[in-house]
Amino acid sequence: MKVRLVSMLLIAGSASAVNAADIKEGDTLQTLSNLHPDKQEILSINYQLPSKIPVCANVTVKKVSKGAMVFDYEGSEYQFVLDKHTKGADISLQQAAQAYFGPKCDEAKMKSMSKVDQEGIASGRAQVGMTREGVMLAMGRPPFHANPSLDVPEWMYWRNRFARVAVQFDDKGKVTNVR
């Protein structure tokens, strides 16, 4: 009985902690990585398209629903959409959005990163020699359904619906290959 009660309290505490951080209409946030929109839409699968909203960009949340978040960036409206693969991995819109948007990005930390990390972040692409953290800032979190753990030697991204990009790391967390 005690174990069940403690478990229920832990679950309830976890749920309220997550809900307290939920992104809501009117929030002013920053991008935690580069985003790669397809016109005015960003799918939570995080396609690596040529266009880019830079890391640390200021955005204002206009609307949040169960499956999408509308935000304003530099006077243009964008929509962050929960795709079926992310949803199938049991990730909510809030969880997915919080991987890419937050109250403040760490610009000072980015400026202290290596030259290769800074170049990759600026280009929005992974390069050999970058750190995991640099890749995360440059490309965003890899898709949840294909990368449930980030502590693996290869992250798989989708360039678009048909092509993938694999980023391989050595045991020190540095990129050894991008294919």
Description of each model-found segment:
Residues 74-110:
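Boundary regions of SH3-family modules and the immediately adjacent low-complexity/disordered segments
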Residues 1-2:
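N-terminal secretory signal peptides that target proteins for export/translocation
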Residues 66-70, 74-79, 110, 115-179:
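A cross-family detector of function-defining hotspots
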Residues 5-14:
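Sec-dependent N-terminal signal peptides
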